[in-house]
């Protein structure tokens, strides 16, 4: 009987997502229509800074210019140990998508009031990816309705838990 060779598993999440930053305000301010995954063209010091989980998606958005998708206003601070090769923190970064996806996004943005908003940024198999959402902006009353719906749902779950425990 042949012995099976066992290899040591590498530490860390090799096949999974390692989240760098999330845009929590995006789901509050926008109703998400469709979600895409895009790669990001970065410089070396940007990747090093992202490995330390330094990034802010708060004011970031994406645009389609000349058949290319650009991520604007994403803040990646300068790498602490970088030298003169350090990057500019708020430069425009190219997003890597398939041509069909870019054409779909461009068509939907042109026909309706849609925005491209980054939801999260993460490492996937050593590559930086952005979860990009095709979204429509919410009005103040929409936000209030969502909050009321969420509170009501939370109260129902709380009450069911009390009844299950025999308290209510």
Curated annotation (Swiss-Prot):
Location of region: Disordered: 1-20
InterPro entries, per database record: SmpB (IPR023620), SsrA-bd_prot (IPR000037), SsrA-bd_prot_CS (IPR020081)
Record keywords, A-Z: Cytoplasm, RNA-binding
Pfam families: SmpB
Entry GO CC: cytosol
One GO term of the biological process aspect: trans-translation
Compartments, record wording: Cytoplasm
GO terms, molecular function: RNA binding
Principal location: cytoplasm
Top-level division of the source organism's lineage: Bacteria
Family statement drawn from the similarity comment of this UniProt entry: Belongs to the SmpB family.
PANTHER family: SSRA-BINDING PROTEIN, TMRNA-BINDING COMPONENT OF TRANS-TRANSLATION TAGGING COMPLEX
Function: Required for rescue of stalled ribosomes mediated by trans-translation. Binds to transfer-messenger RNA (tmRNA), required for stable association of tmRNA with ribosomes. tmRNA and SmpB together mimic tRNA shape, replacing the anticodon stem-loop with SmpB. tmRNA is encoded by the ssrA gene; the 2 termini fold to resemble tRNA(Ala) and it encodes a 'tag peptide', a short internal open reading frame. During trans-translation Ala-aminoacylated tmRNA acts like a tRNA, entering the A-site of stalled ribosomes, displacing the stalled mRNA.
Protein name: SsrA-binding protein
Organism in which the protein naturally occurs: Mycobacterium ulcerans (strain Agy99)
């Amino acid at each position: 009987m042949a012995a099976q060779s066992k290899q040591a598993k590498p530490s860390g999440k090799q096949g999974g997502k390692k989240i760098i930053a999330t845009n929590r305000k995006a789901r509050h301010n926008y109703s998400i229509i469709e979600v895409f995954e895009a790669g990001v063209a970065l410089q070396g010091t940007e990747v090093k800074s992202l490995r330390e989980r330094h990034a802010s998606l708060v004011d970031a958005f994406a645009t389609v210019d000349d058949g290319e998708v650009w991520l604007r206003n994403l803040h990646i601070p300068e790498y602490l140990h970088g030298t003169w090769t350090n990057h500019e923190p708020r430069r425009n970064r190219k997003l890597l998508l398939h041509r069909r996806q870019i054409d779909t996004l461009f068509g939907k943005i042109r026909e309706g009031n849609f925005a491209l908003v980054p939801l999260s940024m993460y490492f996937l198999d050593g590559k930086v990816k952005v979860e990009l959402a095709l979204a429509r902006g919410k009005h103040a009353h929409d936000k209030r309705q969502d909050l009321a719906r969420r509170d009501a749902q939370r109260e129902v779950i709380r009450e069911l838990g009390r009844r299950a425990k025999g308290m209510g």
